[in-house]
Every structure is written in C-alpha cells, then in structure tokens.
C-alpha cells in the first residue's frame, strides 16, 4: 500500500545468525482505494533518495547510506548524496592498519560496523570525496580501488606486515588506490592526521572538523519518537546512539533485532516493522539472497525458488519502503496504493497477513539483465513465503555457494534495524 504523506514530508553468506555478524553482500552478476470521505493526511511514507548500484560487496554500506539519507531528507527536505566510498575507504583502512595476515580485503560488514565507522570518521558527501562520481549510479572507483588494494596485498607494498602496521603508509596506499586528489587527502590529513592519530569519537575532539567531514552530531535527521508519538528534528547521532559494535544505547537509538523463530513472535516482529513504515521510519533489513528466487517481476519468491532449485547465494542488506497485507476480513491493502489511517490500524492486527515487504535495493534502477518488470525501478518485493523460508543453504566453495551441495536449511530473514521503542518483548 502507499503510505500517503503530508506535503511537508517531501552478503559471502552469513556463517551464523546474529545482529553483529558481518555481511558479505551478493550483488547481481552482470486495487484498493482509500475509503470515500476518509482523510489520509495523517498517513506518512518514506521519502527515499535515488537508487544506486553497488559495484562490490558492500551492500551494508549502501543500505546504511540510504537510511541516513532518508532520515536527513525528512528533516531538511533536501536530497543529500552521502559518500559510500568514504565509509568504504575507512573500513578498508581499519582492516589493513592492524598488520594482521591477509591476502585480500573483506568487503562485508553490518549495521554495527557502519555505526562505529560513523562514530570515528563521520561522513562526507560524494561531491566532496570522489567528485567525479557525485552523479553516478554506480561507483567504478570502488571496484578499481578494491582491485588495486588486493594486488598490493599480493605483490605490492601492503604484502609486507611492517607496512600494514604503519598507518601513514597504509593511508598512502589507500589514497593512491582510490585516486584521491590532493585537496581530499589534505582534508583527511587535517582532521585525522597522516597516520590517523585522531578520530572524531575522542573526547578531545570538541569542535566541528570542517574540511567537508561531518560529524554525526552535526548532521540533521528527523526521527519519529514512539514514546511521545511525535516527529523530532534531531541529529544523526541520536539515531545511532552511543556504544560499541556489539550494542548501541540512547533514548532514540535504533537497535538491530534478530528475526524470531515462532509464528507468534514473527507476527509481533512484522508489526514492529509495519509501525515503523507507518511512521515514515526507514528500516534496514538483513536477509539471505538466493538469486534463483528472483522472478522477472522483481519479486523474491519461494515458489520460484522451489521451481528452479538453489542458485547463487549470499547475504544482503536493503532498506524497507512499503508492504502489502491481507486484512482479517480478506481485503488486501496493495503496495503502491492509498490507505487510510483506519485501514493501517487494521493492518496491525495479529490476524492480518503480510504478503510481502518492498525494499529499496542497491542493484541499480533499471536492470533488464536481471528482471523485466518492477513496481518501482530499483525496488524488490520480498514475499513472506520466501522471508520465512526455510530455504536450502548451500556450502560455500572458493568464495561462491555451490548449488549442488546444500545439506542445510535457513530462514532468509535474519534481522532488522528497528527504531527505539519497537522490537522489545517480541520473543523468539
């Protein structure tokens, strides 16, 4: 259903379940109307920014950027283009700078990973980091940089553990691989030091860093407060909260919550997600992809997967946008169509059945090589029959799943990042 807005609102596969597990993303290889006379002014929708296309396995960064951009756009009315490349740069830096043995960069991560990166390094707009890609749907710079760093790890400077223990040398290799110009390098030097002796989370960093690097505490956001049922204009740091990779705290801090196993708890979980969407709150979802479940109509379907058998698999993170639900009386509230406040209240009944959740993806807007039709370009419908599973889980070999060797099973829906006040007492 369409959640109507007032005019002022303009993964390599996971090895185990858990909110803190790193996701290595799997990019693709190449009519019910509102009731007459009913007001819809108090129903909201998520005002997403444009769809992008990942070129490497960092979907978790793209999903997080979409989440950040949506929170910011609700506050400012302006579409910010946050740099996924900037966070990717620092994710690689932290892997390389510890000097441990490695032959290639891991592109996987999680919500906890991105929250920590933002704590330490803030964010930049794409125009201020890789200006040449400020209007691009897909970053070729990321894939080129990944190839360059992996080659350096195999045959170049980064092959030497001593170099990897020298933070200034690691940064120099990254700057070269990313093709950063002197102005951008100078900005990073000024804020963090050439050897990254400073980060934004240190107690002595009290002033705004400027130099186009933005702290979370200075980046505008709007969050729905479920304790007061009001929209609050706050800062991104309020949504992130404080804490470590393992947990975040704060009165408005979002939390990563695992999808439960029992039918009753799953319905409670789904209702929490529905409430978030009703309140125009973006929700990040982590799930397992099997590309043989993807239909030409841009849906992930258990029926399609059963017909075709297991295919290439991996972890994935996306941001929710909408959903379709059958009410207890059999009426269907369709995704993309108007719904009144009364109907949405009925959609939260435990007897209502969600048919699918629609997500904003990071695989590009128009992909005739992957799907021929989509309700919204760049968005996918995840049918509950698929999300609930179970589906066959295939063994990974040489970095790829083997569809001929699938001894286990898994529930595709892993977790969601829910706003404060929701997700408590869901059960298991």
Where are these regions (language model features)?
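N-terminal Sec signal peptide cleavage junction
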Residues: 23-25
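Active-site-adjacent substructure of cysteine-protease-like catalytic cores
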Residues: 158-161, 258-358
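Active-site nucleophile-adjacent alpha helix/oxyanion-hole segment immediately C-terminal to the catalytic cysteine
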Residues: 37-238, 243, 271-279, 283, ...
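Bacterial N-terminal signal peptides that target proteins for export
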Residues: 1-12
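Processing junctions and N-termini across compartments
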Residues: 18-19, 53
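Mixed-charge, low-complexity intrinsically disordered regions
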Residues: 231-260, 304-308
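Conserved catalytic-core surface of thiol
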Residues: 335-428
């Amino acid at each position: 259903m369409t959640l109507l807005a007032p005019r002022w609102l303009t993964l390599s596969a996971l090895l185990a379940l858990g909110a803190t597990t790193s996701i290595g993303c799997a990019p693709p290889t190449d009519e019910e109307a509102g009731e007459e006379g009913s007001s819809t002014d108090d129903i909201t929708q998520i005002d997403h920014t444009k769809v992008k296309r990942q070129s490497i396995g960092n979907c978790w960064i793209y999903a997080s950027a979409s989440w950040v951009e949506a929170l910011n756009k609700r506050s400012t009315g302006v579409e910010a283009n946050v740099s996924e490349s900037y966070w990717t740069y620092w994710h690689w830096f932290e892997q390389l700078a510890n000097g441990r043995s490695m032959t290639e960069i891991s592109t996987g991560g999680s919500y906890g990973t991105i929250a920590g990166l933002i704590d330490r390094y803030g964010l930049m707009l794409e125009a201020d980091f890789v200006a040449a890609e400020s209007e691009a749907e897909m970053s070729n710079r990321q894939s080129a940089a990944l190839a360059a760093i992996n080659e350096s790890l195999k045959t170049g400077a980064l092959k030497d553990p001593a170099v990897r223990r020298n933070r200034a040398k690691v940064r120099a290799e990254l700057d070269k691989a990313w093709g950063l110009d002197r102005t951008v390098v100078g900005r990073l030097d000024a804020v963090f030091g050439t050897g990254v002796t400073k980060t934004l989370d240190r107690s002595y960093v009290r002033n705004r860093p400027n130099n186009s690097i933005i702290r979370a505490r200075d980046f505008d956001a709007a969050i729905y407060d479920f304790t007061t049922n009001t929209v609050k204009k706050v800062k991104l740091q309020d949504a992130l909260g404080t804490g470590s990779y393992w947990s975040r705290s704060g009165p408005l801090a979002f939390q990563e919550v695992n999808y439960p196993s029992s039918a009753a708890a799953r319905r409670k979980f789904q209702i929490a997600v529905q409430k978030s969407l009703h309140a125009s709150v973006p929700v990040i979802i982590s799930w397992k992809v099997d590309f043989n479940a993807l239909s030409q109509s841009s849906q992930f379907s258990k029926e399609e997967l059963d017909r075709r058998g297991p295919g290439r698999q991996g972890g994935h993170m996306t941001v929710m946008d909408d959903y379709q639900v059958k009410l207890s009386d059999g009426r269907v509230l369709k995704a993309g169509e108007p719904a009144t406040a009364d109907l949405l209240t009925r959609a939260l009944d435990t007897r209502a059945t969600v048919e699918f959740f629609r997500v904003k993806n990071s695989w590009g807007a128009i992909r005739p090589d992957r799907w021929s039709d989509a309700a919204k370009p760049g968005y996918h419908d995840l049918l509950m029959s698929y999300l609930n599973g179970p589906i066959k889980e295939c063994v990974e070999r040489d970095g790829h799943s083997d569809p001929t060797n699938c001894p286990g099973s898994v529930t595709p829906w892993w977790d969601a990042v829910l706003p404060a006040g929701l997700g408590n007492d869901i059960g298991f």
